[in-house]
Structure formats: C-alpha cells, structure tokens
Amino acid sequence: ASDVYKRQDQLNAQARHALMGNLGIQYTYADEDRVEATMPVDHRTRQPFGILHGGATLALGETVAGLGSMILCQPDEIVVGMQVSGNHISSAHEGDTVRAVATIVHKGRSSHVWNVDVFTSTNKLVSSIRVVNSVMKKR
C-alpha cells in the first residue's frame, strides 16, 4: 500500500491547480480504510439558488474515494474512476462547509468500492455516494 496519505499537506498543495483546488476541497484525514475532506459551499460549489450543487458534491465524493484507492494501490498500479452515483438527501447552504467521509466497502484486486457520506457542519447528512474505482497496472 502507498504511504501517500501521510503527506496531506503535499496532496493539498498539488491539488491547488486542479479540480480539487478549484472547488476548495481540502483533505483532512486519510488512512487505508477511511478518507475525509472538506469543501466550502460558496460561489464555486453552489447552484444559483444558494445551495450546494449536486455535481460538486459528486466531485467531492469521487475525490475522497480516489485518494482512498490510491492509498491501497501498489507503486506499479493506478486508479481510475468507473462509476459514481449519489442520492442527495438534504441541502447545504452557501456559507457552510461540507465534510465527506469515505469508507471502503470492497477491496478487490481489480476494483474498489467506496461509500461516501457528505455532511453539513452540523452533521446533517446531505448526500450518500457510491464510487467504484478500477485498479490497473501502470503501462
């Protein structure tokens, strides 16, 4: 398994100029079974009505599950997303910060399945997301 999760500051710095940085996503915890990150509900992640955009929520879910799978992979492997689906249960409003908690459901040789729950700052469940990642050998 990779020790990438031990370098959260480095991961957050690298993400600054990618989708994660554009959405304000910050990793806050990571180990081989769980990854957590936060994302602000602001002009970058909200709908015109001032609530969290479902697409931004799914991007947050895929981000934490992707890091989780990277942690589980060997140095000669890469991870790509295969499937993301989510149920949006309640809303988060502009000015809040949501927290994603990804937990591993299946650690297979060629695929990983993650459950990601997204909460408001008051621990209200916003979305429940399922992510399937494919594990492949580097070419």
Q: Would you name each region that the model predicts?
A:
Residues 106, 133-135:
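A short acidic/small-residue loop/turn micro-motif
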Residues 1-5:
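Short, small-residue-biased leader/transition segments that mark boundaries at the very start
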Residues 78, 89-115, 119-128:
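Beta-rich strand-turn-strand
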